[in-house]
């Protein structure tokens, strides 16, 4: 949606290369409810995809993937690494303090500030504040950005609870990139000065 993009690469047996754009919400709902078994996806010339798994079969109307907007290329300069479990836990402990409405855009996001090898995550809605500090290893560059709450909610759904699995976070002036397993999540940052 130009604010948030998620890309995941999975291994599969490809009979014929192709590209199609499907409604992400519908596709993920179908896949989430399928049994844990092999899934077959077939697409016809009218951009209708048939998803089959065991006795389940679904048809989804799609459109040409040629016009699909891909994730922006992020220059990986400023970065930090931490466990997926730690990031997931941090989001869950702070996200409730973000504002659900857009009256004050800044309060719909969380501050991610890296200073002196500590990541400080702050959620604030005008009535409550949640702060979490995480010690980082290595030499992290100082960073101060505001990440949309919507992005953090989506990330917390797909992060592993495994303390051994790592997430790399890259910062630019306009975007943040979360990279873990075979997944990349890119989000625009909220512009402005956090309180």
Which ranges hold each PLM region?
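Structural preference for solvent-exposed beta-strand-turn elements
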Residues: 1-195
């Amino acid at each position: 949606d130009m604010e948030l993009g998620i890309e995941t690469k999975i291994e599969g047996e490809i009979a014929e290369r192709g590209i199609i754009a499907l409604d992400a919400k519908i596709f993920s709902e179908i896949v989430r409810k399928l049994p844990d078994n092999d899934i077959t996806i077939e697409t016809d010339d009218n951009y209708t995809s048939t998803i089959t798994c065991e006795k389940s079969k679904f048809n989804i109307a799609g459109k040409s993937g040629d016009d699909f907007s891909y994730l922006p290329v992020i220059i990986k300069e400023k970065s930090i690494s931490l466990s997926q479990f730690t990031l997931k836990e941090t989001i869950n402990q702070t996200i409730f303090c973000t504002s659900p409405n857009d009256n004050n855009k800044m309060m719909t996001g969380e501050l991610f500030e890296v200073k002196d090898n500590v990541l400080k995550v702050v959620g604030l809605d005008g009535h409550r504040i949640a702060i979490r500090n995480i010690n980082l290893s290595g030499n992290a560059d100082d960073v101060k950005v505001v990440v949309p709450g919507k992005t953090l909610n989506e990330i917390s759904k797909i992060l592993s609870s495994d303390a051994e699995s790592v997430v790399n976070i890259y910062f630019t002036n306009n975007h943040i990139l979360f990279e873990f397993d075979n997944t990349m999540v890119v989000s625009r940052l909220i512009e402005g000065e956090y309180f």
